[in-house]
UniProtKB/Swiss-Prot annotation:
Database matches in InterPro entries: Rbsml_uS13_C (IPR027437), Ribosomal_uS13 (IPR001892), Ribosomal_uS13-like_H2TH (IPR010979), Ribosomal_uS13_archaeal (IPR019977), Ribosomal_uS13_CS (IPR018269)
Name of the featured protein: Small ribosomal subunit protein uS13
Keyword Magnesium among UniProt keywords: no
GO BP annotations listed: translation
Function as written in the Swiss-Prot or TrEMBL entry: Located at the top of the head of the 30S subunit, it contacts several helices of the 16S rRNA. In the 70S ribosome it contacts the 23S rRNA (bridge B1a) and protein L5 of the 50S subunit (bridge B1b), connecting the 2 subunits; these bridges are implicated in subunit movement.
Origin species: Pyrobaculum aerophilum (strain ATCC 51768 / DSM 7523 / JCM 9630 / CIP 104966 / NBRC 100827 / IM2)
SUPFAM superfamilies linked: S13-like H2TH domain (SSF46946)
Length: 152
């Protein structure tokens, strides 16, 4: 009795490898890591070591719902966007929403001309790292060898 395994499973607007274990396949979604994937599986009662492509359709639909609505399942400290500046709600963003939110945050810092925004706009390091010797940009000055002595 061989079970059909789907090669590609679509969860959270991301194509996942159906031949991988559920937890490791879910971790390929941007915004979901291994810890989040195991937490989702535990919350739904799905074996995290089962093969994703072998799961029945109803469990895949449950996984998709849980990935999109993790803010309803998990406590606030587990989410990746607590107290969203626009809505004030605790959210867990995935995929392109996460990338766009980070870009909006940087653009807001630039617009407000905060210290971090100024550093971002100048292309410098933002988090207090040293910049004297590292983080240089532009062409590198190569080192040239002297010509070998002719008589030797």
């Amino acid at each position: 009795m061989s079970q059909e395994i789907r090669a590609i499973v679509r969860i959270g607007d991301t194509d996942l490898d159906g031949n991988k274990q559920v937890a490791y396949a879910l971790a390929k979604i941007r915004g979901i890591g291994i810890a989040s994937a195991y937490a989702i599986c535990w919350k739904l009662g799905i074996d995290p070591h089962a093969i994703l492509g072998a799961l029945p359709e109803d469990q895949i639909n449950k996984l998709d719902w849980a990935v999109r609505n993790l803010h309803e399942l998990a406590p606030a400290w587990f989410l990746n966007r607590r107290k969203d500046p626009e809505t004030g709600r605790d959210l867990h963003l995935i995929g392109s929403e996460l990338v766009l939110a980070a870009k909006r945050d940087v653009d807001l810092m630039k617009k407000l001309k905060s210290w971090k925004g100024v550093r971002h706009s100048l292309g410098l390091k933002v988090r207090g790292q040293r910049t004297v010797t590292t983080g240089r940009f532009g062409a590198t000055a190569g080192v040239t060898k002297k010509k070998a002595a002719a008589g030797k």
